[in-house]
Regions:
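Exposed beta-strand and adjacent loop surfaces of beta-rich binding modules
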Residues: 75-77, 128, 176-178
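Well-ordered beta-strand positions enriched in small/hydrophobic/aromatic, beta-favoring residues
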Residues: 76-78, 131, 169
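Short, low-complexity, polar/charged sequence segments that are solvent-exposed and flexible
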Residues: 64-66, 94-99, 109-111, 123-128, ...
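A short, structural micro-pattern
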Residues: 72-74, 99, 123-126, 163-165, ...
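ATP/nucleoside-binding phosphotransfer catalytic cores, i.e., glycine-rich phosphate-binding loops
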Residues: 135-205
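Internal helical hairpin/lid segments
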Residues: 102-145, 151
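Catalytic core of DAGKc-family lipid kinases
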Residues: 1-112, 118, 165
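Short low-complexity stretches enriched in small and charged residues
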Residues: 83-92, 123-130, 150-162
Length: 205
């Protein structure tokens, strides 16, 4: 069950038997993809690093993950069809040719992309994805100003940036556009069908 406002999230307990330690979002995604393609259950993920780990307050302490002080959390999973090819992401999807020109789409399950606080109000277990769609026409100067604010998460509304918080979204590009999932480029696509899978992951921090 996704988190409800003002309700506690997760419970104390160590990484379960069979749990897998991951040190980045890319490592977490690799575990997810392997088990989804095999049709097997995704094991609990012990988060030692990455943007999802930072979003949920992870400390990167392996000893803690194996102790009763650890916290076990239900976490949503991002799912995307890239021109009909199925993939998953744990923290974020980015589709762009360049940060500084052209259209940019960021779909956030977590809060961070590296040092950038992209989705300060996002939560990885609220059943929704935070979608930021930057129009091709957004001037370079405005992009640079937005980048400076990303480090602190102090976003200012801009007419060239469409923001949504939705369980699913369809994105269409006029030509194939490179797509990154959890920081790794996975190919290019024109049509992206994206949705959240609530409570699909168990993460331990």
């Amino acid at each position: 069950m996704t988190i409800e406002k003002h309700q506690p999230w997760g419970e104390h307990g160590p990484l379960p038997a069979g749990g897998v330690l991951v040190r980045s979002d890319a490592e977490a995604r690799a575990v997810v993809e392997r088990h989804r393609r095999a049709g097997t259950e995704i094991p609990a993920l012990g988060l030692l690093g990455g943007d999802l780990c930072r979003t949920v307050g992870g400390r990167g302490d392996e000893g803690r993950l194996r102790s009763p002080d650890a916290v076990v959390l239900p976490v949503d999973l991002g799912s995307v069809l890239l021109d009909g090819r199925q993939h998953w992401f744990t923290s974020h999807l980015v589709a762009r040719r360049s940060w500084w020109r052209g259209r940019v789409v960021a779909v956030m399950n977590g809060q961070w992309i590296g040092r950038w606080d992209v989705a300060p109000k996002g939560h990885p277990n609220d059943g929704r994805l935070d979608v930021y769609d930057v129009a091709q026409a957004m001037p370079l100067g405005d992009r640079l100003a937005a980048r400076r604010r990303l480090a602190s998460g102090t976003h200012v509304p801009h007419p060239a940036i469409e923001v949504q918080r939705v369980p699913a979204v369809q994105v269409e590009f006029d030509r194939p556009t490179p797509v990154w999932l959890d920081g790794e480029r996975v190919g290019s696509a024109r049509t992206l069908s994206i949705r959240t899978e609530p409570d699909a992951l168990t993460c331990v921090v």
